[in-house]
Structure formats: structure tokens, C-alpha cells
Curated annotation (Swiss-Prot):
Key words of the record: Chloroplast, DNA-directed RNA polymerase, Nucleotidyltransferase, Plastid, Transcription, Transferase
Source domain of life: Eukaryota
Any single GO BP term: DNA-templated transcription
Organism: Aethionema cordifolium (Lebanon stonecress)
Transferase found in the keyword field: yes
Oligomer and partners: In plastids the minimal PEP RNA polymerase catalytic core is composed of four subunits: alpha, beta, beta', and beta''. When a (nuclear-encoded) sigma factor is associated with the core the holoenzyme is formed, which can initiate transcription.
GO annotation, cellular component aspect: chloroplast; DNA-directed RNA polymerase complex; mitochondrion
Gene3D superfamilies xrefs: 5' to 3' exonuclease, C-terminal subdomain, DNA-directed RNA polymerase, insert domain, RNA polymerase, RBP11-like subunit
Function text: DNA-dependent RNA polymerase catalyzes the transcription of DNA into RNA using the four ribonucleoside triphosphates as substrates.
Subcellular location as annotated: Plastid, Chloroplast
Family according to the record: Belongs to the RNA polymerase alpha chain family.
Protein name in UniProt: DNA-directed RNA polymerase subunit alpha
Domain topic, free-text comment: The N-terminal domain is essential for RNAP assembly and basal transcription, whereas the C-terminal domain is involved in interaction with transcriptional regulators and with upstream promoter elements.
Molecular function, one GO term: DNA binding
Length: 333
């Protein structure tokens, strides 16, 4: 456990971790301060951060399990102590950490007798288990058991739909919430017009993220929500039939490339892969996930299409514009 004395700055706004500990493999705690704040600011930031921590964070869970010859999820299998339902509940509790986008597959393939734990899950390189000792099932006889797993990274929660079983696979309720709890408190000091505040923020996580990582990610998510307001002067807002609509900034370089494409350049664009553009990893992964592999694929999508891509923001579109402008000569030749 790490604990530090609280020192209040009278000058620059700063944050600091004043306590950090790991209570167990699946329970981390962190306590942070932000100061000095003007009266009222601590509550504004504290409420926003708590909501971002509890509602906007992404997590990784097992969302589906598949094994042959299982009639329904409340059945029992000879040679296995637990029912299928109990095994699914145990899989639901497995805490994973990953940097993947979307879904991936994993596998359990063991021979009894013996105990099956999270250590027996064969995972892709992008996923790791927080607690290898988590129990899954007990094999009481020398039988072979193979279970295919689907792993997904998402936010919020996902409830399985009744009768929604595909090819003998069973959906698992998933809670994509690495932050188990978050609280904030305020300490006021000073008098009169010089009254200031210290914000205390407490974060508990399940090990998918550390409290410090959760604080950073929640902060980034909040910043991304407000970025469009910083560029409001670049956008045209208007009302039509009582509906609010937004017209995005022009895509000048896109128009220039469209002209090139009309000059028989389309074949060239088909063989310029986005790998060659040196895009940031997150933007690159989002484009690949949306089946955008070449410059031609990219140009066939409008700005509005790109904004609709999951986890994509207007700042990402502007970043692509900057990179295309930087590579103008390479693309135009």
C-alpha cells in the first residue's frame, strides 16, 4: 500500500495519487486529489468523473460459450460436478485485461479428473487473465472437455436474450465495467473570496484497469466529449423542421483526390494500402475493423460515414486529413 501526505498547491492546478493498494487480485483501490479549485469546481468535476468512471469505461468479458452435446444451459453433464448453468456463471466472473477491438475467440480443452481454472483458458496474445485461480468447473471422471469461448471488449453491460442460442453456443451476461465503485468528496479551505476546494476521488477497480489507468481513460473520454465544442466556429448549425443538424467542415483534400480519381487514378488508389499512411494505431484499427483497407476504400467514405464508425471522432477525421495532406505528393504521383 502506498500513502502520501496531502500537500495543497497555492499556485498551479495539479492532481496526485495519495493512496494506492491492491486488496486482492481482483480488487484495486486508489485515492486521488485535485487542487486548488475555485468554489463549486470540485463538485462539477467530481460528478462528471464519477459518471465517466462508472458508465463510460470499456472492459473485456467472456460473452459466449460453445460445447457439443449440451441440450440446454440447465443440463448436467456426466463426469462434471457443476451444471452447465454454474459453469456459465463461473465464466461470467472471469476478469480479463486486453487492448483488443471487437471480439476474439479463446478455448478450454482439458482432460479429467481435475479442477478447471482460468489458467486453463487458451487466449490470444492481446488478452490476459487477471486471476488465474478463478474456478470454472470440476471434472470427476477421465473425460475430455472442450469449450469454445467468445471474448468481447465493450462498455456498459450486455444481457443474454432468451432462446438466443446459435449452433449449440450459449450467451453469457457480461458486465463491461472495470470500475466497481467511485466516490468523490470535497474539502474547503480559506475564507471569503479566497475560499478554495480540494477534490478527493476514490476509485475501486477489478484489476482490468488500475485506478490510475481508469482515471486517465475517464479523463480522455470526457475531453473527447467536449472537443467538438472547441471547434464550433468551424461548423454550421441550423434548424430544419425543429431538428438540430450539423454540417461538418469541408473535406478539401478529399475533393482534390476525387478529381484525381476521375483522371483514371482509381486503379492506383486501389493499391495504396492504409498501412502505408502511418496512421495512429487506434485510427488504423478502427478503419480495418470497418473493412477500409486501401486509399480507395477510404475515399469512398464521406466524413459522415467515418464519424459513424464505432469509437471514431471528428478529431480522427481531421488527423486523417493532416496525414493525407502530408502525403499529397506521394499520392498524386
Amino acid at each position: 500500500m502506498v500513502r502520501e501526505k496531502v500537500k495543497v498547491s497555492t499556485r498551479t492546478l495539479q492532481w496526485k495519487c495519495v493512496e494506492s493498494r491492491r486488496d486482492s487480485k481482483r480488487l484495486y483501490y486508489g485515492r486521488f486529489i485535485l487542487s486548488p479549485l475555485m468554489k463549486g469546481q470540485a463538485d462539477t468535476i467530481g460528478i462528471a468523473m464519477r459518471r465517466a468512471l462508472l458508465g463510460e469505461m470499456e472492459g473485456t468479458c467472456i460473452t459466449r460459450a460453445k460445447s457439443e452435446n449440451i441440450p440446454h444451459d440447465y443440463s448436467n453433464i456426466v463426469g462434471i460436478q457443476e451444471s452447465v448453468h454454474e459453469i456459465l456463471m463461473n465464466l461470467q466472473e472471469i476478469v480479463l485485461r486486453s487492448n483488443l477491438y471487437g471480439t476474439c475467440n479463446a478455448l478450454i480443452c482439458v482432460q479429467g479428473p481435475g479442477s478447471i481454472t482460468a489458467r486453463d483458458i487458451i487466449l490470444p496474445p492481446s488478452v490476459e487473465i487477471i486471476d488465474n485461480t478463478q474456478h470454472i468447473a470440476t471434472l470427476t471422471e477421465p473425460i475430455d472437455l472442450c469449450i469454445g469461448l467468445q471474448i468481447e471488449r465493450n462498455r456498459g453491460y450486455s444481457l443474454k436474450m432468451p432462446n438466443h442460442f446459435e449452433d449449440g453456443s450459449y450467451p453469457i451476461d457480461a458486465l463491461f465495467m472495470p470500475v466497481q465503485n467511485a466516490n468523490h468528496s470535497i474539502h474547503s479551505y480559506g475564507t471569503g473570496n479566497e475560499k478554495q476546494e480540494i477534490l478527493f476521488l476514490e476509485i475501486w477497480t477489478n484489476g482490468n484497469l488500475t485506478p490510475k489507468e481508469a482515471l486517465h481513460e475517464a479523463s480522455r473520454n470526457l475531453i473527447n466529449l467536449f472537443i467538438p465544442f472547441l471547434h464550433v466556429e468551424e461548423e454550421t448549425f441550423y434548424l430544419e423542421n425543429n431538428q438540430h443538424k450539423v454540417t461538418l467542415p469541408l473535406f478539401p483534400f478529399h475533393n482534390r483526390l476525387v478529381k484525381l480519381r476521375k483522371k483514371k487514378k482509381e486503379l492506383v488508389f486501389q493499391y495504396i494500402f492504409i498501412d502505408q499512411l502511418e496512421l495512429p494505431p487506434r485510427i488504423y484499427n478502427c478503419l480495418k475493423k470497418s473493412n477500409i483497407h486501401t486509399l480507395l476504400d477510404l475515399l469512398n467514405n464521406s466524413q459522415e460515414d467515418l464519424i459513424k464508425i464505432e469509437h471514431f471522432h471528428i478529431e480522427d477525421v481531421k488527423k486523417i486529413l493532416e496525414i493525407l495532406e502530408k502525403n499529397r505528393k506521394f499520392i498524386s504521383n
